[in-house]
Curated annotation (Swiss-Prot):
Belongs to the class I-like SAM-binding methyltransferase superfamily. CmoB family. GO terms for biological process: tRNA wobble uridine modification. It catalyses: carboxy-S-adenosyl-L-methionine + 5-hydroxyuridine(34) in tRNA = 5-carboxymethoxyuridine(34) in tRNA + S-adenosyl-L-homocysteine + H(+). Homotetramer. The keyword Repeat does not apply. GO terms for molecular function: transferase activity, transferring alkyl or aryl (other than methyl) groups. Catalyzes carboxymethyl transfer from carboxy-S-adenosyl-L-methionine (Cx-SAM) to 5-hydroxyuridine (ho5U) to form 5-carboxymethoxyuridine (cmo5U) at position 34 in tRNAs. Carboxy-S-adenosyl-L-methionine binds at K64, W78, K83, G102, D124, P125, S126, V151, E152, Y171, R286. This is tRNA U34 carboxymethyltransferase. Keywords: Transferase, tRNA processing. It comes from Sulfurimonas denitrificans (strain ATCC 33889 / DSM 1251). InterPro entries: CmoB (IPR010017), Mo5U34_MeTrfas-like (IPR027555), SAM-dependent_MTases_sf (IPR029063). It comes from the Bacteria.
Amino acid sequence: MNINEIRKERQKWMQWKNIAPLREVIEHLGDVTCSVELGDVVTIKGKPLKNIEDTARLMMPWRKGPFEVFGTYIDSEWRSNIKYNLLRKHFNLKDRRVADIGCNNGYYLFRMQEDAPKLLVGFDPSPLFKTQFDFINRFVKSDIVYELLGVEHLEFYEDKFDTIFCLGVLYHRSDPVSMLKSLYKGLDKEGEVILDTFYIEGDEEICLSPASSYSKIPNIYFVPTISALKNWCLRAGFSSFEVLETSLTSSDEQRKTSWIEGESLEDFLDKNDNTKTVEGYPAPSRVYVRLKKGIK
């Protein structure tokens, strides 16, 4: 697989009629003197820019965040700081080569800079999310590399990684073991993956396979028990499987705001019983695990 050829082809996506005007707006922002704070809210401070809120709203929906840009608070659908803070005590990225698979607009990558990693690379084949990233990075001026690539390109990438984050991606794959193998192949020796996915309670090595959708999401294929997830990971070649955290998704973490379009968590759950999805399945819960490659 020729990664450079794929890069060239996908760069053309930035000329799509819904993306090109956004790119032009960003290019005309000019150079601005500002300061950056990488806390729960990724904050950019400085002399207010004209029409900055209008510019940011052109890039809706904002799924991950929050950000504050010259006084404009981008109240994203997900309060991504909650997940980041939950995981924060479980990793140290200093001098490590780090990838974030399905990085969206780069919120986690911006936060990870505080660890002084050797390399930060985001993978996400979404021109809109890359445009959001470029908008924020116009002011942050980070060295983060954003690739319009997916997990299937990871094993062919120029670098192998010490730590790969894969948060909220696995359940979108119809062949989860194949995806886990791709993550494995993207690691350097003794590398680690920090992964989260939906799970169901139970000791059996089984999974829920939704008929047509789960929590109104059509491309959810398998929701395993933790035991079944462990088996997938071992089959993919990982030498260890460590549960870090579990959590029930709440409306404090995911909710409607004026920065998204359409529905959010409250619309995905049964109106009379919020422990169930509208389809009658268990409400979304996540398990966070660390997988290690080990030496073979």
